[in-house]
Amino acid sequence: IFRQGVIIKMKKVLLLGGSLFQIPSIETAKKMGYHTIVCDYLPDNPGQHVADEFYSVSTTDKEAVLALARRLSIDGIVCYASDPAAPTAAYVAEQMGFPTSPYASVELLSNKDRFRDFLAKNNFHVPKAKGWAYEEFAQMMEEIHTFTFPVMVKPVDSSGSKGVKKIDDPGQLKAAVDAAMAYSRCKRFIIEEYVEKYGYQIAGDGFSVDGR
């Protein structure tokens, strides 16, 4: 940027993902005066046409994103509307000394089976749940009698309810697990006992500023 003959360096922000739902974050960053850089493995993502720069890098490949961030000397990294990319954003920020939630905490929150185990071990009220690798399907079938149906079958590392199914008997497990695997990068699934909601559900989004 040139102002009165003086070159002012714009700070660079790396945004993970360029889907339609992520365009508002790119536009907002540009309005705030940042040089916007988007990475996404999908070649037809619309965000690349909004950002100042685009690189074809998977947002879930944390080492590749870190290498890109270092090469471009970014000043910040943002993960917006993408749960799978959240661990990458935390990892890169941690490695580069940016303010961030701890990578270990974000990674734990992004894996349903590990998070359920954490909650249970810390005395939170949670439904009966257990995770298995896809190749452990036979072992799961030997243990499924300990669950009360109906149950939920989910990929451990997906979001937006993708690959999630409610089933009423063990005969439906194979199809449900196969459907979950289509949305799991690590090829793991979790089974949880179904909990019926009573009354109203209150939900919202939170954010922190300066650690508060």
Feature-to-residue mapping (PLM):
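ATP-binding N-terminal substructure of ATP-dependent carboxylate-amine bond-forming enzymes
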Residues: 5-105
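CheY-like receiver
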Residues: 68, 143, 176-179
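A conserved helix-loop-beta module that forms one wall/lid of the active-site cleft
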Residues: 94-163, 170
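Conserved ATP-binding module of the ATP-grasp superfamily
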Residues: 125-127, 150-153, 165-198
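Short acidic-glycine loop/turn motifs at beta-strand connectors
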Residues: 208-212
